[in-house]
Every structure is written in C-alpha cells, then in structure tokens.
Amino acid sequence: VYAACDKEYFKEHAPSLVYSLNDIGKDIHIHICDPDASVHNIEAVLKKDIDVQLTCSYNDIGATPIDARAYYSCLRFMMTPNILPSANEMLIVDVDCVFMNDFEWPTTDTGYFPRQPLEGTVGWEADGTRVAAGCVYLTAKAMNVANAINERIKEGPMRWFIDQIALSEVFARVDEKDITKFDGNFMDWEFVDDTVIWTGKGPRKYENQKYLAAKKSFNRLGLAADNLWRKSVE
C-alpha cells in the first residue's frame, strides 16, 4: 500500500494508516515531501513498533507550487513511476484513510474507482469528479499507465481535480479486461462498518466522530515506547 504527503500530514495522519495496515498484515510505503527531524523520529518509532514493513522516500518541494493543495494531491501519482518498479503491486491511497478490514489483491494489472460526476457540477469540476482518487491499483506490468498518469498531471494545469482528470482520461484508454473497478463497498466516506477503507473527505476528516474515533483507536504511537521496552526485555 502506498501513500504520499507533506510533513504535517504525515505527523497528523500517517500513524493511524500505518497501524491499521499493520493489523491486516499489509506493507506500506509513504513518500514524504520536505520531511523534518520529527518526521524521521516518528518513522523510526513506527518501523520498530510494527510487524509489517514500512519504507519511506522523500523529495524537496523546491519553489512553492502555484497551487500547493493540488500539488500535494498529485504527489503520490507523480512519484509512482519511481516507486512502482520496486513493488510487485501497489494500492495507492490517501494518507488520511484507515483500513477497517482486510482485502484481497485484484487479479488485474490496474484498478480505480469510477463514479458519476458530482451533482450540480459542470466543466472541469464535473470531469474531475468522475473518479474517486482515494484508491488506485497498479502492478509493475502497468508502468505505462503510471507514466501516462504522471505525464497528464505534468501537462496541467496544476489546479484542484487535475489528479482525478488524469486518472479519468488515462483509464478511459485502458482495456476494460485489465481494470478492477472499486466501489463504495471497498472505499467509502460514509464510514460503513463492513467496508475496507474509510477516507475522510472534506470537513468529514475533522468533524465526523465515527471516523475520528477510528483514527484515534488505530493511532498507537503514544504506546510505542512502552511496547518497544517490553519487546526489549522479553
């Protein structure tokens, strides 16, 4: 499982995601933009406290992008071509999601979450809401798809929804037989108990008490020191 974020989002959200994946036995890679010392400290503690493998990569943002919010939303897809060759397969997710249940890997080489455009939207926004970007699946055999998504994002414009527009346009050219289509039974933002991924969309990530309670219950970073001490004396 793979996600990307800036340093502040890592501190706020990554521990819950990592522990939720640890509970279902799935390895995770997180790409972090502009990490600082506290990010590396959290990363080191997580690696020692979990049973699955956590790997991280990094980049410096350099000049501030025209639309930083859009840049960070696209970061995971822009870095995918660098990371995918070393992974047999990856599920690309939001760093602020949590895994509530285990899942089986798709049998196709690609997967995404198509949906109807958001009611009342037109033009760019309507095109951008045809895809939920919170779960995209690629195997190493789908490098052409990973590269195409990255290239479309680079074409721009770098504004909100460009990642979803890139996904929509690229997956429209992929053979249907090579695609697994995810739906609300796999990922949802209404926080239904038997779905795999809960993701916090918009204000829900700060206001929905069910989602916040799940995030809090997964985040065992505060218990890590005691846990690591117990492991050392056993």
Residue ranges and their predicted role:
Residues 79, 135-137, 197:
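Conserved hydrophobic/aromatic beta-strand scaffold that supports enzyme active sites
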Residues 10, 65-75:
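A short, glycine-/small-residue-rich helix N-cap motif at loop->alpha-helix starts
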Residues 34-39, 95-101, 185-187:
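Short, polar loop motifs at secondary-structure junctions
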Residues 100-169:
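Conserved catalytic core of nucleotide-sugar-dependent glycosyltransferases
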Residues 72-121:
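GT-A fold catalytic core of metal-dependent nucleotide-sugar glycosyltransferases
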Residues 1-62, 85-86, 223-230, 234:
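N-terminal anchoring/stem segment of glycosyltransferases
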Residues 140-232:
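Catalytic core and acceptor-binding pocket of nucleotide-sugar-dependent glycosyltransferases
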